[in-house]
Amino acid sequence: MLRFMPVGDSMTIGSAGEHTWRHRLWQLLRGTYDPAVTLVGPRETLYDQQTGAPTSLDYADPDFPRAHLAGWGEGWLHMAPLIGDAIRDCRPDVLLVSLGLIDLGFYTNAEQTAENVRAFITAARAADPCVRMVLLPVIPNVRAESDAPFADQVALFNVLLAKAVADLDEPRSPILLASPPPSYDIHVDTYDGTHPNASGEHRIAEAFAGAMREAWGIGRACVARTV
């Protein structure tokens, strides 16, 4: 049984009333790979947009392993210092990481964000030299559509992320660069230009699953869903 730890920002923690892509991926993997697959992490809640705090357990379907390491407004900058303890405490086999939008939007430029990616990987391997990782580039979002300098930073960061994966991948602790969800459309797959709706959740889940299927033979292809 493989243990997966989702690591991310608001798109990963999700909001009250949502399924989240975490749930969609768990469903996908247990149906196409191993019914005993599980998600692990030090956190469990959703973000409550009414209170502005990660205090909700109001999942659209709560009957799944809800654990994660994700936070509204958190990025590589925030997760790099946390990942070591999270790995030691929760013992994941695979990290599924979707970060970068918050860093680029509020804290660091593309080069600085890429350095935090490398710090994250170093800290993860210090906790478990054999941990596997799947990293998702920053996907389309409303700010990149309307803010050309920000879009340039996103594009540069995604190039630097790919370079970090190429530089740091190693046999005992492989790192995969997932492809952005094909045909991801912020006007169809999000509810506000950034955060995924049901179809977006399925697309993000399949991006992670597809990378692992192609590289590691985990699972098999399935028909994309939108609900």
Write out the residue ranges for each language-model feature:
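Conserved SGNH/GDSL esterase-like catalytic core that processes O-acyl groups on lipids
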Residues: 4-5, 11-115
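Histidine-centered active-site loop/cap adjacent to the catalytic His
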Residues: 5-7, 189-227
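Sec-exported extracytoplasmic/periplasmic mature domains
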Residues: 12, 26, 30-34, 88-91, ...
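Surface-exposed patches in mature extracellular/periplasmic domains of secreted proteins
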Residues: 32-44, 132-136, 177-178, 219-223
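N-terminal hydrophobic signal/anchor transmembrane helix of membrane proteins
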Residues: 80-91, 167-196, 201
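Active-site cleft segment of glycoside hydrolase catalytic domains centered on the general acid/base Glu
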Residues: 81, 105-120, 144-157, 190-199
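Active-site segments of SGNH/GDSL-like serine hydrolases
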Residues: 98-105, 121-156, 179-184
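Substrate-gating cap/lid alpha-helix
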Residues: 140-179, 198-202
